């Protein structure tokens, strides 16, 4: 999977989230659903959380950190 594939998959899935959810909440829950605990690791270990923060810069940083963690985990295998 490339970074662009990752981004595309997230935003396609975000489009299917409940309309009542905030943008950051949609991104966080989508990544958690698709990729497991990487969202929680970024939230709790890296200190980047978009669940309650809908600013684009926070969401983009959260997505980038998730991608980095996923790539780092795959390199260790």
Language-model-derived ranges and their functions:
Residues 1-77:
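C-terminal alpha-helical interaction appendages
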